[in-house]
């Protein structure tokens, strides 16, 4: 059984409170929030005021994914928003080890994300310190993209790296997740699946979350 983190990027922003309440009732394990700056990725989403508002009504831990340049500038703000996981991109951090330590020192779980074309070797020197590895199975920036199949073998390679290093990190995958791709990722060793469009575009999002969780 995998854990599920529905992505609020696919929620109805005119009725965000309603959608968060729905997720509270659901079997979702986390709420995934994507912060985009229009520089690191070609889109702008939302920032800390929205995350703070969500945290006031959310009953699930917040999984905050920063798709921005220089994410180390915002560690304290993310903490103050009530984040459980703070995820930064390896590609956006010159001093990745330092950023991971800053996140942990702030009292959050430290996570590092890799874009589809980034090799897993980028994690080699920090994997032992991580709580979570987020593998992108689409190129980040927009919801509703098609799944990149190479993510499946990437999950297996990160799983091996975690075992060899003695790390306790879990593996999360984000992008193009549905029942078919989710089953393949779970079989490969993924612990958490981020699902946006597949959940929020379904006729019964709560039932869809429950179905994903049974994979």
Model-derived features: positions:
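Conserved N-terminal beta1-alpha1 strand-loop-helix module at the mouth
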Residues: 1-87, 92-95, 102, 110, ...
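Acidic, divalent-metal-coordinating active-site segment for phosphoryl/phosphodiester hydrolysis
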Residues: 176-188
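Catalytic cores of soluble, metal-dependent hydrolases
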Residues: 183-184, 193, 201-202
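Predominantly soluble domains enriched in secretory-pathway, periplasmic, or organellar proteins
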Residues: 100-102, 118
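Short acidic loop-to-helix transition motifs that present clustered carboxylates
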Residues: 117-119, 178
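Short, acidic/turn-prone active-site loops that include or flank metal/cofactor-
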Residues: 90-93, 115-117, 138-141, 197-200
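Glycine-rich beta-strand-to-loop/alpha-helix junction loops that act as flexible
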Residues: 173-176, 194-198
């Amino acid at each position: 059984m995998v854990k599920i983190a529905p992505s609020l990027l696919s929620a109805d922003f005119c009725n965000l409170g309603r959608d968060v309440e729905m997720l509270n009732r659901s079997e979702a394990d986390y709420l995934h929030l994507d912060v985009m700056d229009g520089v690191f990725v070609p889109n702008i989403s939302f920032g800390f005021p929205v995350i703070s508002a969500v945290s006031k009504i959310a009953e699930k831990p917040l999984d905050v994914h920063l798709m921005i340049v220089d994410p180390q500038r915002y560690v304290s703000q993310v903490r103050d928003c009530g984040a459980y996981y703070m995820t930064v991109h390896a590609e956006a951090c010159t001093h990745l080890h330092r950023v991971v330590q800053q996140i942990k020192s702030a009292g959050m779980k430290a996570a590092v994300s890799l874009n589809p074309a980034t090799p897993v070797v980028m994690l080699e020197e920090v994997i032992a310190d991580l709580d979570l590895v987020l593998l992108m199975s689409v190129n980040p920036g927009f919801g509703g993209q098609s799944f990149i199949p190479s993510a499946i073998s990437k999950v297996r390679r990160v799983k091996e790296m975690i075992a060899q290093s003695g790390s306790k990190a879990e593996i999360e995958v984000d992008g193009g997740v549905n029942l078919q791709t989710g089953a393949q990722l779970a079989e490969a060793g993924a612990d958490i699946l981020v699902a946006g469009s597949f959940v929020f575009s379904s006729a019964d999002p709560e039932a869809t979350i429950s179905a994903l969780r049974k994979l």
